[in-house]
Amino acid sequence: MNNRVHQGHLARKRFGQNFLNDQFVIDSIVSAINPQKGQAMVEIGPGLAALTEPVGERLDQLTVIELDRDLAARLQTHPFLGPKLTIYQQDAMTFNFGELAAKMGQPLRVFGNLPYNISTPLMFHLFSYTDAIADMHFMLQKEVVNRLVAGPNSKAYGRLSVMAQYYCNVIPVLEVPPSAFTPPPKVDSAVVRLVPHATMPHPVKDVRVLSRITTEAFNQRRKTIRNSLGNLFSAEVLTGMGIDPAMRAENISVAQYCQMANYLAENAPLQES
């Protein structure tokens, strides 16, 4: 028997499809999401409706974004969900969540079992819409969740950690074994809750500058920032901000990265592209 076939659908490797089938895990995720009627609920990658059905049962209307044409067609003819669903058959990586929030008249509550092959770039895409999002609940590769929640001075701490925590409060919810999926992935999974900050704890003047600094620092994470960021900051400037130039990228807090970004935005602003 082909273990990539679930409910008559062949899981597509190119879409990173692994279908959730453990009822206890499904119930735990839905409980964590706690969907309520009247909320603007949006699911990314509903697949075979493992989460769509129990969430949809609690709602009058649910928006889903599904790239796979066959799966989108199955949802359109779903026996009890069909009339409740608004289906966008397109790539979430190019979806305009801001336009959808404006159309629905309220911030979105976004959830999904994200394809692991695009989870990190998709997170960055979603961060650009946090003004339009109330919260997010995602099943991700456990290693990605570890990176999202990691603090300074740890191996998991990186650019994703800094940018996620700049935009959101990041809360791990539960861990999920490979056996909860068909086909079973080769990695452990975990569910995470991300709640965009109502008030930014560390506001930056230009988030593009923060993105540039974190990219350059973590691309050379074994170097001291005196070397990795030497083209942006002198040792004297870093010391003046209370940041030791001998530290490495993983030693610098989110607050310090934001401090550096604001200095650069004031003293060497990026040109509008």
UniProtKB/Swiss-Prot annotation:
Its main location: cytoplasm. InterPro entries: KsgA/Erm, rRNA_Ade_diMease-like_C, rRNA_Ade_Mease_Trfase_CS, rRNA_Ade_methylase_Trfase_N, rRNA_adenine_dimethylase, SAM-dependent_MTases_sf. It catalyses: adenosine(1518)/adenosine(1519) in 16S rRNA + 4 S-adenosyl-L-methionine = N(6)-dimethyladenosine(1518)/N(6)-dimethyladenosine(1519) in 16S rRNA + 4 S-adenosyl-L-homocysteine + 4 H(+). One of its GO terms (molecular function) is RNA binding. Keywords: Cytoplasm, Methyltransferase, RNA-binding, rRNA processing, S-adenosyl-L-methionine, Transferase. It is found in: Cytoplasm. S-adenosyl-L-methionine binds at residues 18, 20, 45, 66, 91, 113. Pfam families: RrnaAD. GO terms for cellular component: cytosol. Its EC number is 2.1.1.182. Specifically dimethylates two adjacent adenosines (A1518 and A1519) in the loop of a conserved hairpin near the 3'-end of 16S rRNA in the 30S particle. May play a critical role in biogenesis of 30S subunits. Belongs to the class I-like SAM-binding methyltransferase superfamily. rRNA adenine N(6)-methyltransferase family. RsmA subfamily. This is Ribosomal RNA small subunit methyltransferase A. It comes from Escherichia coli O81 (strain ED1a). The gene is rsmA.
